[in-house]
Amino acid sequence: MSNQPNRIIIFDTTLRDGEQSPGATLNGDEKLTVARALARLGVDVIEAGFPYASPGDFEAVQQIAKVVGVEGGPSICGLARATKADIAKAAEALKPAAKPRIHTFLATSDIHLAYKLKKTRQEVLEIVPEMVAYAKSFVDDVEFSPEDAGRSDPEFLYQVLERAIAAGATTVNIPDTVGYLTPSEFGQLIRGIKENVPNIDQAIISVHGHNDLGLAVANFLEAVKNGARQLECTINGIGERAGNAALEELVMALHVRRQYYNPFLGRPVDSTEPLTNINTKEIYKTSRLVSNLTGMAVQPNKAIVGANAFAHESGIHQDGVLKNKLTYEIMDAESIGLTNNQIVLGKLSGRHAFSTRLKELGFELSETDLNKAFLRFKEVADKKKEITDWDLEAIVNDEIQQAPEVFRLELVQVSCGDQARPTATVILRGPEGQELMDAAIGTGPVDAVYKAINRVVNVPNQLIEFSVKSVTAGIDAMGEVTIRLKYENRIFSGHAANTDIIVASARAYISALNRLYAAIEQEKAEKEKAAVTSAS
Protein backbone atom coordinates (compact mmCIF):
# COMPACT_ATOMS: atom_id res chain seq x y z
CA MET A 1 0.00 0.00 0.00
CA SER A 2 1.71 3.23 -1.13
CA ASN A 3 1.73 6.27 1.10
CA GLN A 4 -0.14 8.35 -1.46
CA PRO A 5 -2.57 6.08 -3.35
CA ASN A 6 -4.55 7.39 -6.31
CA ARG A 7 -7.72 5.80 -4.97
CA ILE A 8 -9.76 5.96 -1.77
CA ILE A 9 -9.11 3.37 0.95
CA ILE A 10 -12.30 2.23 2.66
CA PHE A 11 -11.79 1.53 6.38
CA ASP A 12 -14.89 -0.12 7.84
CA THR A 13 -15.50 0.26 11.57
CA THR A 14 -18.97 -1.32 11.76
CA LEU A 15 -17.66 -3.99 14.13
CA ARG A 16 -16.00 -1.48 16.45
CA ASP A 17 -17.55 1.99 16.38
CA GLY A 18 -20.79 0.80 14.78
CA GLU A 19 -21.29 -1.80 17.47
CA GLN A 20 -21.29 0.98 20.07
CA SER A 21 -24.83 1.88 18.97
CA PRO A 22 -27.26 1.09 21.83
CA GLY A 23 -28.58 -2.44 21.29
CA ALA A 24 -26.23 -3.26 18.41
CA THR A 25 -24.07 -5.72 20.36
CA LEU A 26 -23.08 -8.78 18.31
CA ASN A 27 -21.74 -12.12 19.47
CA GLY A 28 -18.54 -13.64 18.06
CA ASP A 29 -20.25 -15.68 15.33
CA GLU A 30 -22.28 -12.67 14.19
CA LYS A 31 -19.16 -10.50 14.04
CA LEU A 32 -17.46 -13.14 11.89
CA THR A 33 -20.49 -13.24 9.58
CA VAL A 34 -20.34 -9.45 9.15
CA ALA A 35 -16.55 -9.55 8.62
CA ARG A 36 -16.95 -12.12 5.84
CA ALA A 37 -19.60 -9.92 4.20
CA LEU A 38 -17.29 -6.89 4.45
CA ALA A 39 -14.52 -8.88 2.76
CA ARG A 40 -16.91 -9.80 -0.08
CA LEU A 41 -17.89 -6.14 -0.29
CA GLY A 42 -14.25 -5.28 -0.89
CA VAL A 43 -13.37 -3.03 2.05
CA ASP A 44 -9.63 -2.45 2.43
CA VAL A 45 -9.48 -2.44 6.23
CA ILE A 46 -11.81 -4.03 8.79
CA GLU A 47 -11.57 -2.59 12.29
CA ALA A 48 -12.63 -5.78 14.05
CA GLY A 49 -12.85 -4.49 17.61
CA PHE A 50 -11.10 -3.31 20.76
CA PRO A 51 -9.15 -6.38 22.01
CA TYR A 52 -8.34 -4.99 25.46
CA ALA A 53 -11.98 -4.11 26.19
CA SER A 54 -13.14 -7.64 27.02
CA PRO A 55 -12.26 -11.32 26.51
CA GLY A 56 -15.15 -11.55 24.03
CA ASP A 57 -13.80 -8.69 21.94
CA PHE A 58 -10.30 -10.19 22.00
CA GLU A 59 -11.60 -13.57 20.80
CA ALA A 60 -13.71 -11.95 18.06
CA VAL A 61 -10.76 -9.95 16.71
CA GLN A 62 -8.53 -13.03 16.85
CA GLN A 63 -11.08 -15.17 15.00
CA ILE A 64 -11.65 -12.54 12.31
CA ALA A 65 -7.88 -12.15 11.90
CA LYS A 66 -7.59 -15.91 11.42
CA VAL A 67 -10.58 -16.53 9.13
CA VAL A 68 -10.97 -13.27 7.18
CA GLY A 69 -7.51 -11.73 7.43
CA VAL A 70 -5.99 -14.18 4.97
CA GLU A 71 -3.49 -13.46 2.20
CA GLY A 72 -5.26 -11.41 -0.46
CA GLY A 73 -7.98 -10.38 2.01
CA PRO A 74 -8.50 -7.09 3.86
CA SER A 75 -6.21 -5.69 6.53
CA ILE A 76 -7.53 -6.51 10.01
CA CYS A 77 -7.27 -3.72 12.54
CA GLY A 78 -7.53 -3.66 16.32
CA LEU A 79 -8.11 -0.50 18.35
CA ALA A 80 -5.87 0.31 21.32
CA ARG A 81 -5.51 3.24 23.67
CA ALA A 82 -2.03 4.74 23.84
CA THR A 83 -0.91 2.35 26.58
CA LYS A 84 1.46 -0.60 26.39
CA ALA A 85 -1.12 -3.01 27.83
CA ASP A 86 -3.72 -2.09 25.18
CA ILE A 87 -1.24 -2.22 22.32
CA ALA A 88 0.24 -5.57 23.37
CA LYS A 89 -3.25 -7.07 23.67
CA ALA A 90 -4.18 -5.82 20.19
CA ALA A 91 -0.96 -7.23 18.74
CA GLU A 92 -1.66 -10.63 20.28
CA ALA A 93 -5.21 -10.73 18.89
CA LEU A 94 -4.01 -9.72 15.42
CA LYS A 95 -1.21 -12.32 15.16
CA PRO A 96 -3.13 -14.65 12.77
CA ALA A 97 -3.79 -11.87 10.23
CA ALA A 98 -1.74 -11.67 7.04
CA LYS A 99 -2.03 -7.85 7.15
CA PRO A 100 -2.45 -6.72 10.77
CA ARG A 101 -2.90 -3.07 11.76
CA ILE A 102 -2.83 -1.52 15.22
CA HIS A 103 -4.89 1.65 15.58
CA THR A 104 -3.85 3.63 18.65
CA PHE A 105 -5.25 6.95 19.79
CA LEU A 106 -4.80 9.78 22.28
CA ALA A 107 -6.86 12.94 22.69
CA THR A 108 -5.35 16.29 21.67
CA SER A 109 -8.08 18.86 22.34
CA ASP A 110 -7.62 21.08 25.40
CA ILE A 111 -10.97 20.03 26.86
CA HIS A 112 -9.99 16.34 26.68
CA LEU A 113 -6.51 17.02 28.06
CA ALA A 114 -7.86 18.98 31.01
CA TYR A 115 -10.90 16.90 31.99
CA LYS A 116 -10.35 13.37 30.66
CA LEU A 117 -6.62 12.72 30.39
CA LYS A 118 -5.48 15.29 32.96
CA LYS A 119 -2.24 15.68 31.00
CA THR A 120 -0.28 18.60 29.59
CA ARG A 121 0.48 19.15 25.92
CA GLN A 122 4.13 18.31 26.56
CA GLU A 123 3.16 14.97 28.09
CA VAL A 124 1.06 14.15 25.01
CA LEU A 125 3.99 15.07 22.73
CA GLU A 126 6.10 12.52 24.62
CA ILE A 127 3.49 9.73 24.91
CA VAL A 128 2.43 9.67 21.24
CA PRO A 129 5.81 8.80 19.61
CA GLU A 130 6.61 6.33 22.39
CA MET A 131 3.34 4.41 21.92
CA VAL A 132 3.43 4.54 18.11
CA ALA A 133 6.97 3.13 18.19
CA TYR A 134 5.82 0.43 20.61
CA ALA A 135 2.99 -0.54 18.24
CA LYS A 136 5.48 -0.51 15.36
CA SER A 137 7.57 -3.11 17.22
CA PHE A 138 4.68 -5.56 16.71
CA VAL A 139 3.33 -4.68 13.23
CA ASP A 140 4.44 -2.70 10.18
CA ASP A 141 1.06 -1.00 9.72
CA VAL A 142 0.28 1.48 12.50
CA GLU A 143 -2.50 4.05 12.53
CA PHE A 144 -2.60 6.96 14.97
CA SER A 145 -5.64 9.10 15.80
CA PRO A 146 -5.51 12.40 17.71
CA GLU A 147 -8.94 12.09 19.36
CA ASP A 148 -11.15 15.19 19.02
CA ALA A 149 -8.81 16.62 16.38
CA GLY A 150 -11.66 18.82 15.15
CA ARG A 151 -11.53 20.87 18.35
CA SER A 152 -7.76 20.75 18.83
CA ASP A 153 -5.40 23.69 18.41
CA PRO A 154 -4.11 23.28 14.82
CA GLU A 155 -0.49 24.15 15.65
CA PHE A 156 -0.40 21.59 18.46
CA LEU A 157 -2.12 19.03 16.22
CA TYR A 158 0.58 19.50 13.55
CA GLN A 159 3.31 18.79 16.13
CA VAL A 160 1.58 15.64 17.38
CA LEU A 161 1.10 14.28 13.85
CA GLU A 162 4.69 15.03 12.86
CA ARG A 163 5.97 13.07 15.87
CA ALA A 164 3.57 10.17 15.26
CA ILE A 165 4.73 9.82 11.64
CA ALA A 166 8.39 10.10 12.63
CA ALA A 167 7.83 7.26 15.10
CA GLY A 168 6.42 5.01 12.37
CA ALA A 169 2.72 5.76 11.87
CA THR A 170 1.74 4.78 8.32
CA THR A 171 -1.74 6.34 8.61
CA VAL A 172 -2.80 9.41 10.58
CA ASN A 173 -6.52 9.58 11.17
CA ILE A 174 -8.28 12.89 11.79
CA PRO A 175 -11.46 12.39 13.83
CA ASP A 176 -14.33 14.82 14.17
CA THR A 177 -15.23 12.96 17.35
CA VAL A 178 -18.36 14.93 18.23
CA GLY A 179 -19.56 15.73 14.70
CA TYR A 180 -19.04 19.47 15.18
CA LEU A 181 -17.28 20.63 12.01
CA THR A 182 -18.84 21.88 8.77
CA PRO A 183 -17.56 20.68 5.37
CA SER A 184 -15.54 23.84 4.69
CA GLU A 185 -13.96 23.68 8.16
CA PHE A 186 -13.12 20.01 7.77
CA GLY A 187 -11.61 20.63 4.35
CA GLN A 188 -9.49 23.46 5.76
CA LEU A 189 -8.33 21.21 8.62
CA ILE A 190 -7.10 18.54 6.18
CA ARG A 191 -5.50 21.13 3.91
CA GLY A 192 -3.74 22.67 6.91
CA ILE A 193 -2.32 19.28 7.85
CA LYS A 194 -1.12 18.71 4.26
CA GLU A 195 0.62 22.08 4.24
CA ASN A 196 2.04 22.24 7.77
CA VAL A 197 3.13 18.72 8.77
CA PRO A 198 6.61 18.38 7.17
CA ASN A 199 6.59 14.57 6.86
CA ILE A 200 2.91 14.14 5.94
CA ASP A 201 3.83 12.54 2.59
CA GLN A 202 5.13 9.54 4.54
CA ALA A 203 1.63 8.69 5.80
CA ILE A 204 -1.90 8.37 4.48
CA ILE A 205 -4.38 10.93 5.78
CA SER A 206 -7.54 9.27 7.06
CA VAL A 207 -10.77 10.84 8.34
CA HIS A 208 -13.29 9.68 10.91
CA GLY A 209 -16.47 11.56 11.74
CA HIS A 210 -19.80 11.41 13.49
CA ASN A 211 -23.13 12.53 12.15
CA ASP A 212 -24.42 14.68 15.02
CA LEU A 213 -25.24 17.54 12.63
CA GLY A 214 -25.93 15.29 9.63
CA LEU A 215 -22.70 16.42 7.95
CA ALA A 216 -20.41 13.36 8.19
CA VAL A 217 -20.59 12.29 4.53
CA ALA A 218 -20.33 15.87 3.24
CA ASN A 219 -17.32 16.45 5.50
CA PHE A 220 -15.58 13.32 4.19
CA LEU A 221 -16.12 14.25 0.55
CA GLU A 222 -14.65 17.69 1.24
CA ALA A 223 -11.71 15.98 2.97
CA VAL A 224 -11.09 13.89 -0.16
CA LYS A 225 -10.80 17.08 -2.19
CA ASN A 226 -8.14 18.32 0.22
CA GLY A 227 -5.96 15.21 0.41
CA ALA A 228 -7.65 12.56 2.57
CA ARG A 229 -7.20 9.09 1.09
CA GLN A 230 -8.79 6.84 3.72
CA LEU A 231 -12.42 7.10 4.87
CA GLU A 232 -13.50 5.48 8.15
CA CYS A 233 -17.16 4.57 7.88
CA THR A 234 -19.84 2.05 8.86
CA ILE A 235 -22.57 0.11 7.08
CA ASN A 236 -25.87 2.03 7.29
CA GLY A 237 -24.01 4.77 9.16
CA ILE A 238 -24.54 3.05 12.52
CA GLY A 239 -22.54 4.21 15.51
CA GLU A 240 -22.64 6.18 18.73
CA ARG A 241 -25.27 8.92 19.10
CA ALA A 242 -26.32 9.96 15.55
CA GLY A 243 -23.94 7.46 13.96
CA ASN A 244 -20.92 7.54 11.66
CA ALA A 245 -20.41 8.40 8.01
CA ALA A 246 -22.32 5.80 5.96
CA LEU A 247 -20.13 3.59 3.78
CA GLU A 248 -22.80 3.12 1.12
CA GLU A 249 -23.36 6.88 0.74
CA LEU A 250 -19.66 7.66 0.46
CA VAL A 251 -18.94 4.88 -2.02
CA MET A 252 -21.89 5.66 -4.27
CA ALA A 253 -21.16 9.40 -4.18
CA LEU A 254 -17.63 8.64 -5.40
CA HIS A 255 -19.02 6.14 -7.92
CA VAL A 256 -21.79 8.30 -9.39
CA ARG A 257 -19.75 11.55 -9.33
CA ARG A 258 -16.47 9.95 -10.41
CA GLN A 259 -15.74 12.58 -13.06
CA TYR A 260 -16.04 15.34 -10.45
CA TYR A 261 -13.65 13.66 -7.98
CA ASN A 262 -11.14 12.24 -10.49
CA PRO A 263 -8.99 15.42 -10.72
CA PHE A 264 -8.62 15.59 -6.92
CA LEU A 265 -6.91 12.19 -7.09
CA GLY A 266 -4.66 13.19 -9.98
CA ARG A 267 -6.69 11.37 -12.63
CA PRO A 268 -8.06 12.54 -15.98
CA VAL A 269 -11.63 13.80 -15.65
CA ASP A 270 -13.01 11.08 -17.92
CA SER A 271 -11.16 8.17 -16.23
CA THR A 272 -13.51 5.21 -15.76
CA GLU A 273 -11.31 3.46 -13.18
CA PRO A 274 -13.26 3.04 -9.91
CA LEU A 275 -12.23 5.33 -7.06
CA THR A 276 -12.63 2.54 -4.48
CA ASN A 277 -12.21 -1.24 -4.39
CA ILE A 278 -15.82 -1.74 -3.30
CA ASN A 279 -17.99 -4.20 -5.22
CA THR A 280 -21.10 -2.02 -5.21
CA LYS A 281 -23.38 -4.95 -6.05
CA GLU A 282 -22.76 -6.25 -2.51
CA ILE A 283 -23.93 -3.02 -0.84
CA TYR A 284 -27.63 -3.77 -0.42
CA LYS A 285 -27.05 -7.32 0.79
CA THR A 286 -24.48 -6.16 3.37
CA SER A 287 -26.79 -3.39 4.53
CA ARG A 288 -29.60 -5.88 5.12
CA LEU A 289 -27.29 -8.27 6.95
CA VAL A 290 -26.08 -5.59 9.37
CA SER A 291 -29.62 -4.32 9.90
CA ASN A 292 -30.92 -7.81 10.68
CA LEU A 293 -28.08 -8.79 13.01
CA THR A 294 -28.02 -5.52 14.96
CA GLY A 295 -31.80 -5.06 14.99
CA MET A 296 -31.31 -1.49 13.76
CA ALA A 297 -33.87 -0.90 11.02
CA VAL A 298 -32.89 1.24 8.04
CA GLN A 299 -35.16 4.28 7.70
CA PRO A 300 -37.29 4.08 4.51
CA ASN A 301 -35.93 7.36 3.10
CA LYS A 302 -32.28 6.48 3.83
CA ALA A 303 -30.07 7.32 0.86
CA ILE A 304 -28.91 4.36 -1.27
CA VAL A 305 -30.31 1.47 0.82
CA GLY A 306 -33.65 2.77 2.18
CA ALA A 307 -36.87 1.10 1.00
CA ASN A 308 -37.90 4.31 -0.79
CA ALA A 309 -34.50 5.11 -2.32
CA PHE A 310 -35.68 3.94 -5.77
CA ALA A 311 -39.45 4.44 -5.30
CA HIS A 312 -41.43 7.14 -7.11
CA GLU A 313 -44.83 8.27 -5.81
CA SER A 314 -45.41 11.29 -8.07
CA GLY A 315 -47.29 10.46 -11.27
CA ILE A 316 -45.02 12.75 -13.27
CA HIS A 317 -41.93 11.03 -11.87
CA GLN A 318 -43.39 7.56 -12.48
CA ASP A 319 -44.14 8.44 -16.10
CA GLY A 320 -40.62 9.74 -16.64
CA VAL A 321 -38.95 6.70 -15.06
CA LEU A 322 -41.03 4.31 -17.17
CA LYS A 323 -39.89 6.13 -20.32
CA ASN A 324 -36.25 6.50 -19.23
CA LYS A 325 -34.88 5.77 -15.73
CA LEU A 326 -32.35 8.57 -16.02
CA THR A 327 -35.12 11.18 -15.94
CA TYR A 328 -35.40 10.85 -12.16
CA GLU A 329 -32.74 8.29 -11.12
CA ILE A 330 -29.02 9.08 -10.98
CA MET A 331 -28.05 5.44 -10.38
CA ASP A 332 -29.40 2.02 -11.24
CA ALA A 333 -30.85 -0.01 -8.36
CA GLU A 334 -29.00 -3.04 -9.72
CA SER A 335 -25.67 -1.23 -9.19
CA ILE A 336 -26.07 -1.77 -5.42
CA GLY A 337 -27.33 -5.34 -5.86
CA LEU A 338 -31.02 -4.51 -5.53
CA THR A 339 -32.58 -6.97 -7.98
CA ASN A 340 -36.14 -6.95 -9.22
CA ASN A 341 -38.58 -8.71 -6.92
CA GLN A 342 -38.48 -11.69 -9.24
CA ILE A 343 -40.55 -14.82 -8.50
CA VAL A 344 -38.13 -17.71 -8.48
CA LEU A 345 -39.42 -20.61 -6.39
CA GLY A 346 -42.57 -22.35 -5.18
CA LYS A 347 -43.63 -25.25 -2.99
CA LEU A 348 -42.65 -27.79 -5.68
CA SER A 349 -39.09 -26.44 -5.90
CA GLY A 350 -36.45 -28.89 -4.69
CA ARG A 351 -33.44 -28.57 -2.44
CA HIS A 352 -31.03 -28.19 -5.38
CA ALA A 353 -32.96 -25.26 -6.88
CA PHE A 354 -33.18 -23.67 -3.43
CA SER A 355 -29.44 -24.11 -2.79
CA THR A 356 -28.52 -22.82 -6.27
CA ARG A 357 -30.61 -19.68 -5.89
CA LEU A 358 -29.16 -18.92 -2.45
CA LYS A 359 -25.64 -19.16 -3.92
CA GLU A 360 -26.67 -16.79 -6.73
CA LEU A 361 -27.89 -14.36 -4.05
CA GLY A 362 -24.51 -14.60 -2.29
CA PHE A 363 -25.40 -16.82 0.67
CA GLU A 364 -22.76 -19.43 1.57
CA LEU A 365 -24.37 -21.85 4.03
CA SER A 366 -23.01 -24.93 5.75
CA GLU A 367 -24.82 -28.22 5.14
CA THR A 368 -26.52 -27.96 8.54
CA ASP A 369 -27.66 -24.38 7.98
CA LEU A 370 -28.82 -25.19 4.45
CA ASN A 371 -30.99 -28.01 5.79
CA LYS A 372 -32.50 -25.71 8.42
CA ALA A 373 -33.19 -22.99 5.86
CA PHE A 374 -34.70 -25.48 3.37
CA LEU A 375 -37.11 -26.85 5.98
CA ARG A 376 -38.20 -23.29 6.75
CA PHE A 377 -38.55 -22.55 3.02
CA LYS A 378 -40.91 -25.54 2.59
CA GLU A 379 -42.92 -24.37 5.58
CA VAL A 380 -43.30 -20.88 4.09
CA ALA A 381 -43.99 -22.23 0.58
CA ASP A 382 -46.97 -24.19 1.93
CA LYS A 383 -48.52 -20.92 3.11
CA LYS A 384 -47.31 -18.56 0.39
CA LYS A 385 -47.88 -19.32 -3.28
CA GLU A 386 -44.88 -17.47 -4.69
CA ILE A 387 -41.44 -17.16 -3.09
CA THR A 388 -39.32 -14.17 -4.13
CA ASP A 389 -35.64 -13.37 -3.68
CA TRP A 390 -36.57 -11.06 -0.81
CA ASP A 391 -38.53 -13.89 0.83
CA LEU A 392 -35.48 -16.15 0.52
CA GLU A 393 -33.31 -13.49 2.11
CA ALA A 394 -35.78 -13.12 4.98
CA ILE A 395 -35.89 -16.91 5.49
CA VAL A 396 -32.09 -17.20 5.68
CA ASN A 397 -31.75 -14.17 7.96
CA ASP A 398 -34.50 -15.43 10.25
CA GLU A 399 -33.46 -19.07 10.39
CA ILE A 400 -29.68 -18.89 10.36
CA GLN A 401 -28.61 -15.46 11.57
CA GLN A 402 -30.07 -15.66 15.08
CA ALA A 403 -28.61 -15.64 18.58
CA PRO A 404 -27.90 -19.10 20.05
CA GLU A 405 -31.16 -20.61 21.29
CA VAL A 406 -31.42 -20.81 25.07
CA PHE A 407 -35.21 -20.65 24.86
CA ARG A 408 -36.95 -22.05 21.78
CA LEU A 409 -40.53 -21.33 20.75
CA GLU A 410 -42.48 -24.59 20.33
CA LEU A 411 -46.05 -23.25 20.09
CA VAL A 412 -47.95 -19.99 20.20
CA GLN A 413 -51.75 -19.77 20.07
CA VAL A 414 -53.90 -16.66 20.41
CA SER A 415 -57.59 -15.98 20.79
CA CYS A 416 -58.85 -12.48 20.12
CA GLY A 417 -61.58 -10.41 18.48
CA ASP A 418 -63.55 -7.20 18.95
CA GLN A 419 -65.76 -8.91 21.57
CA ALA A 420 -63.07 -11.02 23.25
CA ARG A 421 -60.16 -10.36 25.58
CA PRO A 422 -56.90 -11.24 23.78
CA THR A 423 -55.47 -14.44 25.27
CA ALA A 424 -52.24 -16.23 24.39
CA THR A 425 -50.80 -19.63 25.21
CA VAL A 426 -47.11 -20.36 24.64
CA ILE A 427 -44.92 -23.44 24.95
CA LEU A 428 -41.16 -22.95 25.09
CA ARG A 429 -38.20 -25.30 25.38
CA GLY A 430 -35.92 -24.11 28.20
CA PRO A 431 -32.14 -24.12 28.78
CA GLU A 432 -32.14 -27.73 30.02
CA GLY A 433 -34.56 -28.89 27.34
CA GLN A 434 -37.54 -28.75 29.70
CA GLU A 435 -41.02 -27.85 28.40
CA LEU A 436 -42.32 -24.53 29.73
CA MET A 437 -45.97 -23.54 29.22
CA ASP A 438 -48.12 -20.62 30.34
CA ALA A 439 -50.94 -18.34 29.24
CA ALA A 440 -51.76 -14.65 29.67
CA ILE A 441 -54.31 -11.96 28.83
CA GLY A 442 -53.19 -8.72 27.18
CA THR A 443 -54.43 -5.51 25.59
CA GLY A 444 -53.84 -7.11 22.19
CA PRO A 445 -52.64 -10.45 20.80
CA VAL A 446 -48.96 -9.48 20.73
CA ASP A 447 -49.13 -8.04 24.24
CA ALA A 448 -50.76 -11.28 25.45
CA VAL A 449 -48.01 -13.36 23.79
CA TYR A 450 -45.26 -11.27 25.35
CA LYS A 451 -46.84 -11.44 28.80
CA ALA A 452 -47.12 -15.23 28.52
CA ILE A 453 -43.48 -15.51 27.45
CA ASN A 454 -42.37 -13.28 30.33
CA ARG A 455 -44.21 -15.48 32.82
CA VAL A 456 -42.32 -18.51 31.51
CA VAL A 457 -38.86 -16.99 31.05
CA ASN A 458 -38.87 -14.72 34.11
CA VAL A 459 -36.12 -12.42 32.83
CA PRO A 460 -36.82 -8.78 33.78
CA ASN A 461 -36.92 -6.44 30.77
CA GLN A 462 -38.66 -3.43 29.27
CA LEU A 463 -39.94 -3.45 25.68
CA ILE A 464 -38.84 -0.11 24.21
CA GLU A 465 -39.39 -0.67 20.48
CA PHE A 466 -41.65 -2.82 18.33
CA SER A 467 -41.79 -2.45 14.55
CA VAL A 468 -43.36 -4.46 11.73
CA LYS A 469 -42.77 -4.21 8.01
CA SER A 470 -43.70 -6.24 4.96
CA VAL A 471 -40.95 -8.09 3.11
CA THR A 472 -42.85 -8.13 -0.19
CA ALA A 473 -46.18 -6.95 -1.57
CA GLY A 474 -49.39 -8.97 -1.43
CA ILE A 475 -51.82 -10.21 1.18
CA ASP A 476 -49.71 -13.33 1.80
CA ALA A 477 -46.46 -11.37 2.24
CA MET A 478 -43.99 -12.25 4.95
CA GLY A 479 -43.82 -9.75 7.78
CA GLU A 480 -40.59 -8.79 9.55
CA VAL A 481 -40.69 -7.86 13.22
CA THR A 482 -37.86 -6.03 14.98
CA ILE A 483 -37.94 -5.39 18.72
CA ARG A 484 -35.60 -3.86 21.29
CA LEU A 485 -35.56 -4.73 24.99
CA LYS A 486 -33.95 -2.75 27.80
CA TYR A 487 -32.34 -4.49 30.77
CA GLU A 488 -30.70 -2.18 33.32
CA ASN A 489 -28.68 0.17 31.05
CA ARG A 490 -28.26 -2.24 28.13
CA ILE A 491 -30.38 -2.76 25.03
CA PHE A 492 -30.91 -6.08 23.22
CA SER A 493 -32.53 -6.51 19.82
CA GLY A 494 -34.46 -9.35 18.20
CA HIS A 495 -35.59 -9.95 14.64
CA ALA A 496 -37.87 -12.52 12.96
CA ALA A 497 -39.95 -13.01 9.81
CA ASN A 498 -43.06 -15.10 9.17
CA THR A 499 -46.26 -15.06 7.13
CA ASP A 500 -48.04 -14.97 10.52
CA ILE A 501 -47.19 -11.68 12.23
CA ILE A 502 -48.04 -13.06 15.69
CA VAL A 503 -45.54 -15.91 15.22
CA ALA A 504 -42.94 -13.44 13.91
CA SER A 505 -43.54 -11.23 16.97
CA ALA A 506 -43.08 -14.19 19.34
CA ARG A 507 -39.90 -15.37 17.58
CA ALA A 508 -38.41 -11.84 17.58
CA TYR A 509 -39.12 -11.51 21.31
CA ILE A 510 -37.51 -14.89 22.05
CA SER A 511 -34.49 -13.88 19.94
CA ALA A 512 -33.98 -10.71 22.01
CA LEU A 513 -34.52 -12.60 25.27
CA ASN A 514 -31.90 -15.16 24.23
CA ARG A 515 -29.37 -12.36 23.75
CA LEU A 516 -30.34 -10.83 27.10
CA TYR A 517 -30.18 -14.17 28.92
CA ALA A 518 -26.76 -14.96 27.41
CA ALA A 519 -25.44 -11.57 28.55
CA ILE A 520 -26.70 -12.15 32.11
CA GLU A 521 -25.11 -15.61 32.23
CA GLN A 522 -21.82 -14.25 30.86
CA GLU A 523 -21.76 -11.53 33.54
CA LYS A 524 -22.38 -14.16 36.22
CA ALA A 525 -19.56 -16.34 34.89
CA GLU A 526 -17.13 -13.39 34.78
CA LYS A 527 -18.01 -12.40 38.37
CA GLU A 528 -17.51 -15.97 39.58
CA LYS A 529 -14.17 -16.18 37.76
CA ALA A 530 -13.07 -12.86 39.27
CA ALA A 531 -14.12 -14.04 42.74
CA VAL A 532 -12.12 -17.27 42.37
CA THR A 533 -9.08 -15.34 41.10
CA SER A 534 -9.18 -12.85 43.99
CA ALA A 535 -9.66 -15.67 46.52
CA SER A 536 -6.61 -17.50 45.23
From Swiss-Prot:
Top enzyme class: transferase
Pfam families, per the entry: HCS_D2, HMGL-like, LeuA_dimer
Gene Ontology molecular function: any one: manganese ion binding
GO biological process: L-leucine biosynthetic process
Domain Pyruvate carboxyltransferase: 8-269
Region annotation Regulatory domain: where it falls in the sequence: 408-536
Domain of life of the native organism: Bacteria
Record bears the keyword Repeat: no
Cofactor: Mn(2+)
Subcellular location: Cytoplasm
Disulfide bridge partners, by residue number: none
Functional pathway: Amino-acid biosynthesis; L-leucine biosynthesis; L-leucine from 3-methyl-2-oxobutanoate: step 1/4
EC number(s) given by UniProt: 2.3.3.13
This protein's record includes keyword Metal-binding: yes
Function noted in UniProt: Catalyzes the condensation of the acetyl group of acetyl-CoA with 3-methyl-2-oxobutanoate (2-ketoisovalerate) to form 3-carboxy-3-hydroxy-4-methylpentanoate (2-isopropylmalate).
Family annotation (HAMAP family): LeuA_type1 (MF_01025)
Assembly and binders: Homodimer.
Name listed for the protein in its UniProt record: 2-isopropylmalate synthase
Gene responsible for this protein: leuA
